[in-house]
Design a protein with these regions (language model features):
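A glycine-rich phosphate-binding loop feature that marks nucleotide/adenosyl-phosphate handling sites
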Residues: 49-50, 189, 206, 227-230, ...
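Glycine-rich phosphate/pyrophosphate-binding loops
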Residues: 45-49, 180-185, 314, 398-409
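Glycine-rich, charge-decorated loop segments at or immediately adjacent to ligand/cofactor-binding or catalytic sites
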Residues: 116-122, 151, 323, 346-352, ...
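Conserved thiamine diphosphate
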Residues: 79, 134-137, 141-145, 353-402, ...
Length: 474
């Protein structure tokens, strides 16, 4: 084994993984981000994939990417231009040339840079780097596809299945370049493919082969070390905004002593909240995938009336459809958390792109005088606190709360220190059992100190009542 010539220490680096939509760049970037978070680096990530139906393989329209910014100090954004680009084909190189620093490192699969591949990406010469003016970049080239197929013969996989592992070979190269141990990545792959052990072992073999290839063949290339950030002791993980939002709602329900209910309809980029909470039946979470946006929020209003911490998740188009039901929650004075993960454009717009343009809709997009609390999260990790406080405000003030995030925050991830729950305040519902007044109780009787309507859970003896959308005089 040849010795490495030198190791350079960096404070931060931006890495961009890019290839066809089927090349597994999202998984590759996610695993490397998790490795970096476990290692103790600060991270910020941004998955970038087309809004259109999957384009033909190897074309410019079909390029998918994942960018991670990591460092030994506080990282606030996924970064602008990349120090390292993993380009699985010529289209990925061409699409991302504008995102590259002049002296960047580019890792390529030479098997995917043949003339037919260059033609698909609309190159006019057989030298894409010169054609793009990338004379200052350092190229780390490897016949990834060939090596993966040869290395996985023992597993008896067909050609297509074997090539699906080439992203792990590329990940192994990046792990070698940044001195990342492979054990945690192997563990992640075993969990990812727990029901397909042969696929798990094939991916682990490709990962190891990529690392060894870099270590043995490219020994003249400098490797890089990014020290772990000196951080507060505790347990850390890599979390995206949708997952943090889900955990924040669970924490709020726990602090309130309530069961969490989510009634939702799948919509990009909010669907992962429904997916995440549906996994937590062990914590008593109830999820309903309704037939449409209106049904989703109406099931949540019913659950709130029945005594749950109720929530619904959506994006801009869905928030428009839910507006009348939000008005129902306002007039009924029921606690409800509405999560709007904002996306681009009016109408269907750009489902996979990010905007922050729903504020006016959240504030004023309902008929009549229909006030509601509106909050916004600022980072993926901030989504936990924002969701917790949204739940607290909704329950303690008997009101709908709209929590705004966006696709950038929801899909991007950061290193997150898992908080101790004893540092969060209790959530105290204004139950009707606390009602003390000479007047006969009616549905809109209020706590004299807070002016909050009492919450009468169905089944509470002596407090049978009805609520609806018609204005009442009591």
């Amino acid at each position: 084994m040849a010795e490495q010539t030198k190791v350079k220490t960096l404070e931060k680096v931006v890495i961009r993984f890019s290839g066809d939509s089927g090349d597994g760049m999202q998984l590759t970037g996610t695993i490397f981000s998790n490795l970096s978070a476990v290692f103790g680096n600060e991270i910020s990530t941004f998955p970038d994939y087309p809004a259109e139906v999957r384009a033909p393989q190897g074309t410019l329209s079909g390029v998918s990417g994942f960018q991670v910014h990591l460092g030994s100090r506080k990282i606030f954004t996924p970064g602008d231009k990349a120090d390292v680009l993993v380009a699985m084909n010529p289209a990925a190189l061409k699409v991302n040339v504008k995102h590259l620093k002049p002296n960047a490192i580019v890792l390529i699969d030479t098997d995917s840079f043949k003339k037919s591949d260059l033609d698909k990406a609309l190159f006019t010469t057989d030298d894409p780097f010169t054609e793009l003016g990338l004379t200052g970049v350092q190229v780390v080239a490897a016949p990834i596809s060939t090596m993966v197929k040869d290395g996985l013969v023992e597993f008896g996989l067909d050609n297509k299945s074997a090539l699906r592992c080439k992203n792990m070979f590329a990940l192994g190269l990046v792990c070698w370049l940044f001195e990342r141990p492979l054990e945690e990545a192997m563990h992640m792959l075993q969990n990812k493919f727990a029901k397909k052990p042969v696929i798990a072992q094939a991916n682990i073999k490709a990962l190891t082969d990529g690392y060894n290839y870099g270590n043995n063949i490219h020994a003249s290339v400098s490797t890089y070390r990014i020290e772990s950030k000196k951080a507060e002791p505790g347990f850390y993980t890599d979390v995206n905004g949708n997952k943090a939002t889900s955990y924040g709602l669970i924490a709020a329900a726990e602090k309130a002593g309530l069961q969490l209910f989510l009634g939702s309809y799948p919509i990009t980029p909010a669907t992962d909240i429904l997916h995440e909470l549906s996994k937590r039946k062990d914590l008593g979470v109830i999820t309903v995938q309704a037939e449409d946006e209106i049904a989703g929020i109406c099931t949540s209003i019913g659950a709130s009336f029945a005594g749950c911490l109720a929530a619904t998740s959506t994006s801009g188009p869905g928030l428009a459809l839910k507006s009348e039901a939000i008005g129902l929650a306002v007039i009924a004075e029921l606690p409800l958390v509405i999560i709007d993960v904002q996306r681009g454009g009016p109408s269907t717009g750009l489902p996979t792109k990010s905007e922050q343009t729903d504020l006016m809709q959240a504030l004023y997009g309902r008929n009549g005088e229909s006030p509601a609390v509106v909050m916004a999260a600022s980072t993926p990790t901030d989504c936990f606190d924002a969701a917790f406080w949204a739940g607290k405000l909704a329950v303690e003030h008997m009101t709908p709360v709209i929590l705004l995030t966006d696709a950038f925050i929801a899909n991007g991830s950061s290193a997150w220190r898992i908080p101790e729950m004893d540092k969060y305040p209790e959530i105290k519902p204004n139950y009707v059992a606390n009602y003390q007044d000479e007047k006969v109780w009616k549905a809109y009787r209020r706590n004299k100190e807070s002016l909050v309507r009492y919450w009468a859970i169905p089944g509470t003896e002596g407090f049978a009542h009805r609520l609806g959308g018609l204005e009442k005089d009591y």
